[in-house]
Curated annotation (Swiss-Prot):
Family: Belongs to the transcription factor STAT family.
GO MF term set: DNA binding; DNA-binding transcription factor activity; DNA-binding transcription factor activity, RNA polymerase II-specific; DNA-binding transcription factor binding; protein dimerization activity; protein homodimerization activity; protein kinase binding; RNA polymerase II cis-regulatory region sequence-specific DNA binding
Subunit annotation: Forms a homodimer or a heterodimer with a related family member, such as STAT1. Interacts with OCAD1.
UniProt cross-references to Pfam families, sorted A to Z: SH2, STAT_alpha, STAT_bind, STAT_int, STAT_linker
InterPro entries per record: p53-like_TF_DNA-bd_sf (IPR008967), SH2 (IPR000980), SH2_dom_sf (IPR036860), STAT (IPR001217), STAT3_SH2 (IPR035855), STAT_linker (IPR048988), STAT_N_sf (IPR036535), STAT_TF_alpha (IPR013800)
CDD domains assigned to the protein according to its UniProt record, in alphabetical order: SH2_STAT3, STAT3_CCD, STAT3_DBD
Subcellular localization, as worded in the UniProt entry: Cytoplasm; Nucleus
GO annotations of cellular component type: cytoplasm; nucleus; plasma membrane; RNA polymerase II transcription regulator complex
Protein purpose: Transcription factor that binds to the interleukin-6 (IL-6)-responsive elements identified in the promoters of various acute-phase protein genes.
Renumbered ranges of motif Essential for nuclear import: 150-162
GO biological process: cell surface receptor signaling pathway via JAK-STAT; defense response; eating behavior; eye photoreceptor cell differentiation; glucose homeostasis; growth hormone receptor signaling pathway via JAK-STAT; interleukin-6-mediated signaling pathway; leptin-mediated signaling pathway
Residue ranges annotated for the SH2 domain, each copy included: 580-670
Name of the protein in its database record: Signal transducer and activator of transcription 3
Amino acid sequence: MAQWNQLQQLDTRYLEQLHQLYSDSFPMELRQFLAPWIESQDWAYAANKESHATLVFHNLLGEIDQQYSRFLQESNVLYQHNLRRIKQFLQSRYLEKPMEIARIVARCLWEESRLLQTAATAAQQGGQATHPTAAVVTEKQQMLEQHLQDVRKRVQDLEQKMKVVENLQDDFDFNYKTLKSQGDMQDLNGNNQSVTRQKMQQLEQMLTALDQMRRGIVSELAGLLSAMEYVQKMLADEELADWKRRQQIACIGGPPNICLDRLENWITSLAESQLQTRQQIKKLEELQQKVSYKGDPIVQHRPMLEERIVELFRNLMKSAFVVERQPCMPMHPDRPLVIKTGVQFTTKVRLLVKFPELNYQLKIKVCIDKDSGDVAALRGSRKFNILGTNTKVMNMEESNNGSLSAEFKHLTLREQRCGNGGRANCDASLIVTEELHLITFETEVYHQGLKIDLETHSLPVVVISNICQMPNAWASILWYNMLTNNPKNVNFFTKPPIGTWDQVAEVLSWQFSSTTKRGLSIEQLTTLAEKLLGPGVNYSGCQITWAKFCKENMAGKGFSFWVWLDNIIDLVKKYILALWNEGYIMGFISKERERAILSTKPPGTFLLRFSESSKEGGITFTWVEKDISGKTQIQSVEPYTKQQLNSMSFAEIIMGYKIMDATNILVSPLVYLYPDIPKEEAFGKYCRSESQEHSEATDSGSAAPYLKTKFICVTPTSFSNTIDLPMSPRTLDSLMQFGNSSEGAEANAGGQFESLTFDMELTQECASSPM
């Protein structure tokens, strides 16, 4: 099916976007009338080669004539009128600039294709995909769009005024040459001299009018360039800078509000207006060559106008070259900007000027620490080589939205070894996880006679040689992007700035919300603030140093705050993600707060919290119970670590957890998850059902079923030490458990025996918990 026919079948929201593609520059009626022929032409090639553009343009006029003949036979007066008007407009505007119409048509076809892809993606995702244009438009962005519309209108108005000036100049030139061809005016008779003087006066009046119009156009061009400069400043210094800051935030787990499509449309629109204005300035030079005179404003001002428009366009192209996706190892998508030597990483660059004629024209080269002066200034800084496919040509086919981009998928870093096989200098001023490096992308643009060198670079990356360095490397990325928007400060950690608790709290919450469905609550953050800053009432504005966050050990602990928290994040993602997403894990809570909220609850109420003493990350549960005298007791079990959770899910541990009292009776102390959720309701769906266990324990090829086993965690207690808990589960051998002889006979008759593994260590029943 033809592309145009597919577009007609889209929903209204997409058709509205289609209408926005077309204007008087390329009327939608013409797209409708000549749809098959238009789609059969190579407009992108024509936009880059003038001879082919001229041929296609004349063929376009011929197709219009043929369509007009068909409308004539159908007696369709309205279509005849519209088509005649369109042809006259195209001839007047593009006859001498066929590459311009080719570029406009090529862009429209690319935008149409992107629109179809967007609609198809939305359909595949059940209609849930939202188009970037549906994003919220701020008041500032509305003003920007109005300024862009004003620039486009002024460019078109100038185009019409240039034609008027050209026509007036042609009339003046014709009359002047006609008068001059009559011979030497001084030798004419009196009557002829009178006529000549009259014609001379007319020429003088025409020249005065021409001079006024030229001055008006020069003045309008100067004003237009100032308006373009203002819009460009808004785009580069505000919108693009805001996007880059949002990208920094997204890299460290913040909201992923980094779509570039709208910004690309704005920059492309401005670039098109600038190129059209440059052609208008060149047209002034042509007019000057035909007619010039003393005090000609074109002679005085055109060179400056040419210099300004070229400088504006160069700067716009340079700012439009961005890193769309920062370097990231595919195995660690949630931790970009940390790269391990010898491991592939990916990155993507994009040019936010979508000119189809640039497709497959720009070759991108990648290097690292190109401007290595700052890096080399740091004693002992490592140097690296980039291996893999480090050059690529930008194209529009690989991206889903037709943007001009290049994605590098097979890059690796290798450290340059010095003579002793180690770092360049053992007296390094920074540890390796504080070294920052820049990956640079370079290319050259040749467009309409201009050569523009483009260069952009990634955010600073940390290069590690062992995956155990990942936590500290990620802490460096967090601290850098939290506290600065300077994209090239590789010396940042020579004197790392101080952060506030408000900044740190937001970033810490992002570490959970970016990889799970739940961030940190105010109460959880307050507990973390207390661990970092000590007891306090209001932590807002409190300062936190880089060393306190990542390098110094916490009070009474042999590890830093960040190492402890990072292992908890890893624990959540790998072992207890579903429970965290449900909100069942209170996680970070002080012991005082824990005791306060549980002491008013009925026996059997429990909560889940993270261990404060486990460097590798641990989780425990605390419950309330009554002792023999009826006094309320708060008990905690020794934390479960990743090693234990590898063997048994935390939900199954909770569901099967028992206490063995002095009479060897097993009792479950866990009844209600705080505040009052029945244990089975909260955790039952995350455990295997009895029917699943039975089917797994039964061998269909065996004459008799296997004996069924069940692993549970048991804590032994005694009347003498009940109040000395927290209790520590330890491992004991598997035991065959029977209640009494009659129960055993009944079980044997049914062919089922239950084997229970108790987790206990009798020699350390009374060991105090490290929690």
